[in-house]
Amino acid sequence: MEMCGATALTWSHTICPSLHLPRSVSTREARRSFSVWCVSDQDPKGNKMIISVTGATGFIGRRLVQRLHADNHSVHVLTRSKSNAETIFPAKDFPGIKIAEEPEWKDSIQGSTGVVNLAGLPISTRWSPEIKKEIKQSRIRVTSKVVELINSAPDDIRPKVFVSATAVGYYGTSETQVFDEQSPSGKDYLAEVCREWESTALKVNGGVRVALIRIGVVLGKDGGALAKMIPMFKLFAGGPLGSGTQWFSWIHLEDIVNLIYETLSNPSYKGVINGTAPNPVRLAELCDQLGHALGRPSWLPVPDFALKAVLGEGATVVLEGQKVLPTQAKKLGFPFKYSYVKDALQAILS
């Protein structure tokens, strides 16, 4: 399985249509998006940035790189497979983008304005002990490497900001609790992963502004959670997973990209920031709204036992959600474009 930029511990399984990260994208789709970037030491709002990005070929990363490139910022794609990155970001469509394999990361990070860390193995299969270890280590390994390179950079060419993705899995799961940035961490495996992921990012040099964005389920047209849901609904086979009463803390792709972009440029954005929309919903409501937008019923739930048979321990994350609020983003005045899932789905499907 590949390293990808969804980093929000995103699910991908055919039996789990509502929580999916695409295994691949078409060349045409890939050329529209991007995922690894570098920032300069200028004020990002009015000047050119140099942004280094890990996880650049993922769902969020591709769109983020596209945005940065369109705004004439310099982007460094930090990858473990140069050939794969070059396929997704061909030079003729993305002139000026630098693609760097791991031995070249040091030169890319030094002199960058900022670094965005979106790398991590998708949690998209039955959890064996080996898979669980890799889910954690894929995140810790890349984050530790990036932090080491930032810290070793001379002061005058050290990045000024480090934006590291994490996930709402930090809070654990609950049908009754409401979580914000001040809430304690949960006690399950994914909460443990997120705690170690975040603590690794926080080892960065004290002079670097750090933002940890706990990302929810990202909704967009060309990937993420809707990639499997939409085809299933079009076949009149859509419905919630399990009871449907579990909370679904979502965010539109455009909003999460804008939040990361704003975090790069705005010094007020630091510490933990929840990357979720202001109005989370129960999974059954999401499915009802999706069915309505597509003119299809939401009537065929996937039973608990089927998910547990396929995903084992990992089914807990699908069957038990969490209600997470973006308290810090709202305090900072971040302008969510899509606060309600109905509006988000209509925009995606229009």
Task: Label every PLM stretch briefly.
Residues 166, 199-221:
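Conserved beta-loop-beta element that borders a ligand/cofactor-binding pocket
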Residues 45, 259, 263-313, 346-349:
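Mid/C-terminal beta-alpha module of Rossmann-like enzyme folds, strongest
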Residues 49-71:
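N-terminal Rossmann NAD(P)H-binding glycine-rich loop of SDR-like oxidoreductase domains
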Residues 84, 91-145:
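NAD(P)H-binding glycine-rich loop region in Rossmannoid oxidoreductase-like domains
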Residues 207, 219-228, 263-273:
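Glycine/proline-rich active-site loop of Rossmann-fold NAD(P)-dependent oxidoreductases
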